C-alpha cells in the first residue's frame, strides 16, 4: 500500500492522517498528527476465536521522548503506564467496544504510541481518532467509526478541544465520544454546572464528533480493506428452544427473588441442575464441550431476557423497587477513632457499602506527577479498592487494576470541585475508599463516603457531594431509565450512567453503554432523574453531618502559614537545604514552601509551630528606614560600631552618629555587648544598613556641624591601597573570603568592611585613620 495523506482543519488545528507508510504488517495502522502531537495507532486481530468473551485490549503508551524528556528512575526506561495513560486507554476502549458484533470472540489489540506531544493538542483525542480509523480501514470486523472530543465551557460558550490556558479557565472538563448517530461515552468533571449546561456540552461535543466521523468515512472509502470473514459464536437454536421450553419458568422464579444472595443462590442451583441434566444426556458425545458452552450462553441469555422483561413490561425490578426508587440509605461518621485517623465516613446503599478514610499531610507529601506535561504536585488523591470479599468471592489480590484506577479517578473528579483552595487549607489530602459490600454503584458509594470523611475530618468543603448510577433498558424503540442500578441491572442493562454533584450542580459524569449509542432525550431524562435521586442522598448525608467540623481531628497535623517574599525563599531554605533542615531539627516540624512564598508549617505541637514561624519571620525580616531598634553592640571599630538589629541583620553606627558632641573614641560611648537604641537612616542598594544613635536624641541648642575637610587626591587613584590599615584590612579580607566560600548561604549578612571603611574615609576625611601620603 502506498503512502496516503489526508488533512482537514479541526477546532483551530490541522488534523493530518497518514496511511500505508509504517506498521504495514498490522491489520490496520495510521499516523495521526494533530497540531504538533503525533500518535501511531496499530490494530491487530488474532486468527481464531478464543474463550467465551471478547478479548479487546487497548493501550495508550506515553513515550517520554515525545516531550523531549528522559524517563525517571534508575533504568531510565518507560515502565508501567501512568495513571493518565491508563485512564486514556479506558476512555478509548469504552466507545469502540460496542462497535463489534455480538458473538465476536477473536482477540483484538489496539496500541496507541505517542511519538510527539503538544500539550495544546490532545493526545487522547488523536489516539481515539486513530484507534477508530485503524480498525475501520483494517480487515477487522468493526461495525462503524467512532470519534471523541474534549469540551470546555467558558463564559457561556462551549469550546471544542481547548488549549491548556482554556482548560484552566473552564468550569468544565468533558470528554465525549460517539458514532454518527448517537453518543456512547462520557467522562467529565465540572464545577457544579446545571443539567442544562451539561446536556448542551454533550450535544456540542457530538456535533464535533460527527465532523470527525465524516472525515474517517472519506479515508475508509479510499484506503479501507475488505472485512475478514470471522466465525461468530452462535448457539444451537434447537438446543436453545428445548432448554427455554423446559426450564424458563424455573429460572424466572429464581430471578424474581428480591434479596441478592438468595436470588444468586437460587439461580445458580437452577443452572447447575440444568447443566447436570445435559452433561449426563451428552456424556458420550464428542461435542460435549461445545454443547456445554452453548448451554452456558443460553442460560445467561434466559436470565438476561427475564430481567429486561420484568422491567420493561411489568415495571418490576429484581429487588422489587420502583423504576425511580433508591435502595435504603445509611450514613455514619467516625467509624474509626479520631485520635488515630483523621476522618472516616461509612456509606451504605442497599447491599453496596463503602468506607472512606481521610488522611491529611503537608504539601511535601503530595504526589509528584512527571509525565509528558511539566512536572507538578498533585494535592488531592482519591483511591478506590475493591476486594473480592465485597461480593463474597475469592480472587486476585494485588496492585489496583484498570477498573479500580478508573473508579478512583471518577471519585477524585467529583470531590475535587468542592475542595478549599490551597491558601484556605494548605494540606495534601488523601481519601481511600474500601468497598466492603457491592451490589452495583460502588464507585458512587465511594463518593458519598468520601464526602462524609471530608466533613468529619474538618476539611472545609464548599458543599456535600453525592453520586448516583442510572441505568437503561432499551429495545431500540421503547426504553426505561432506572434510578440507582444494582449489579444485575448493570450486568444485563444497556447503560451505566454515573452522575455526581451538589445541590447546586453536577461535579462529575461517566457513561458506559453496551448499545451503539443513546439519544439526547434519554440523556436529558437520565440527568433529571439523577438530580432527584442526588438530592435524596444529600438529605441523608446532611442529616448525619450538616457542615464540616470546625476542628481537625486531634491526630491530624496542625498547620500555620506565613507568606514570605519570593526573593527570601532561598534564605529560608539555605544552601543545600541547610537552613530549613536546621529549623526542622530544632523544632520537629515539617515545612513546605511553594513558589509563591506561601510557607506552611506542620506539627502536632502548636508550640513547635510557633517557634518555627518565629525563626522564619526573623530570617526574612528586613530593616526599614525610620524604624527604631534596641540593638546590641557586636563589634567595635575605630570608625564606629556594628550593632545587631535582629536575627542576622546588623547595622553600622558611624562614630559621628553616636552623639552630637564630637567623639574621639568609640568606646567612650559604647562597649561591646551594650544595648543601644538606634534609628535606621539609610539602606544602600547592597542591603547595607546605616543607623544612628544621636538621631534619637534632641540636637543641642546652637549645635554646628563640623566642617568637612576636602579629600586629598592619591597618586595611585585607589583609596583601597596603602599601608594605613593593612592589619584591619586583612581581617576584613578574611570575613569576605568566608562569605565567598559560603556562596549564597542563607542568613549570612556579614559586611564588606573594607569598602565601608573606604566609603567613610571619602565622606568624612577628618575622621580618616589613613596615614597621609
Swiss-Prot record:
Region (Disordered): 700-773
Feature: compositional bias, Low complexity: 739-748
GO terms for biological process, alphabetical: mRNA catabolic process; RNA processing
Record bears the keyword Manganese: no
Start and end residues of each S1 motif domain: 626-694
Top-tier EC class: transferase
Basic and acidic residues bias (residue ranges): 700-721, 751-773
Catalysed reactions, as listed in the record: RNA(n+1) + phosphate = RNA(n) + a ribonucleoside 5'-diphosphate
CDD domains with a match to the protein in the record: KH-I_PNPase, RNase_PH_PNPase_1, RNase_PH_PNPase_2
SMART domains associated with the record: KH (SM00322), S1 (SM00316)
Domain KH: 557-616
Cofactor: Mg(2+)
Record family assignment: Belongs to the polyribonucleotide nucleotidyltransferase family.
Function: Involved in mRNA degradation. Catalyzes the phosphorolysis of single-stranded polyribonucleotides processively in the 3'- to 5'-direction.
UniProt name for this protein: Polyribonucleotide nucleotidyltransferase
Protein source organism: Lactococcus lactis subsp. lactis (strain IL1403) (Streptococcus lactis)
Gene: pnp
